[in-house]
């Protein structure tokens, strides 16, 4: 598995580059837009952290300027129904620290700025991301604990935990309910969540 590359930029475009290593092998990498924009002109030297995706018919490489951004990419692709292209699109709009601040502030709506992510998907991604990033804090030093998501999702999670449900289970069912019906108010969403939890125990 390729985890790091150093070499000379041969070509670059909006979200990809070809890097020629000293061994004479040229690697094509997909990149977050800001990383691609910051690359030197062809002929310049670059070093990138790499995530490798092995498929039956292809070997895909995703490049990042920092180890934190690569680890955040790996966290994102661990979210259900979120593939590497969507993760790359998110990291084209937010750095690793930006995402930690989004989670810490409870601002799920911020994710809607990413092309291809609607309100329903943003709520689901936000809740799963909050759980996965628990205990991490941005470099600026926001509190390391991840709060319960804001808005309707946060109220549903709070209501379920007050009823004795474990927080991870509450976050998961809240995400499922609001993904299915993103316009529910708190009371209706809580009722749906309780129905799902009751059905799961049968």
Curated annotation (Swiss-Prot):
Residues 145-155 are annotated as: Flexible linker. SMART domains: HhH1. The keyword Cytoplasm applies. It comes from the Bacteria. CDD domains: UBA_RuvA_C. GO terms for biological process: DNA recombination; DNA repair. Residues 66-144 are annotated as: Domain II. The keyword Lipid biosynthesis does not apply. Residues 155-202 are annotated as: Domain III. One of its GO terms (cellular component) is Holliday junction helicase complex. Residues 1-65 are annotated as: Domain I. One of its GO terms (molecular function) is four-way junction DNA binding. Homotetramer. Forms an RuvA(8)-RuvB(12)-Holliday junction (HJ) complex. HJ DNA is sandwiched between 2 RuvA tetramers; dsDNA enters through RuvA and exits via RuvB. An RuvB hexamer assembles on each DNA strand where it exits the tetramer. Each RuvB hexamer is contacted by two RuvA subunits (via domain III) on 2 adjacent RuvB subunits; this complex drives branch migration. In the full resolvosome a probable DNA-RuvA(4)-RuvB(12)-RuvC(2) complex forms which resolves the HJ. Has three domains with a flexible linker between the domains II and III and assumes an 'L' shape. Domain III is highly mobile and contacts RuvB. Belongs to the RuvA family. The RuvA-RuvB-RuvC complex processes Holliday junction (HJ) DNA during genetic recombination and DNA repair, while the RuvA-RuvB complex plays an important role in the rescue of blocked DNA replication forks via replication fork reversal (RFR). RuvA specifically binds to HJ cruciform DNA, conferring on it an open structure. The RuvB hexamer acts as an ATP-dependent pump, pulling dsDNA into and through the RuvAB complex. HJ branch migration allows RuvC to scan DNA until it finds its consensus sequence, where it cleaves and resolves the cruciform DNA. This is Holliday junction branch migration complex subunit RuvA.
